[in-house]
């Protein structure tokens, strides 16, 4: 799976669970993607910050921070 695809899937799941699942569970999901090498440390850090701020992650994030371009 490419970094772009991984990031899209992860962001979709994070947005879907916003306000439904605890922040700890959402952070664990990000951690699991990072541990599998599916996202970079920079992406990991930015997503953790977004989760802690309870932000919706839009497509611009994926465009700006994907490793594929």
Language-model region placement:
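N-terminal acidic leader/helix
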Residues: 2-25
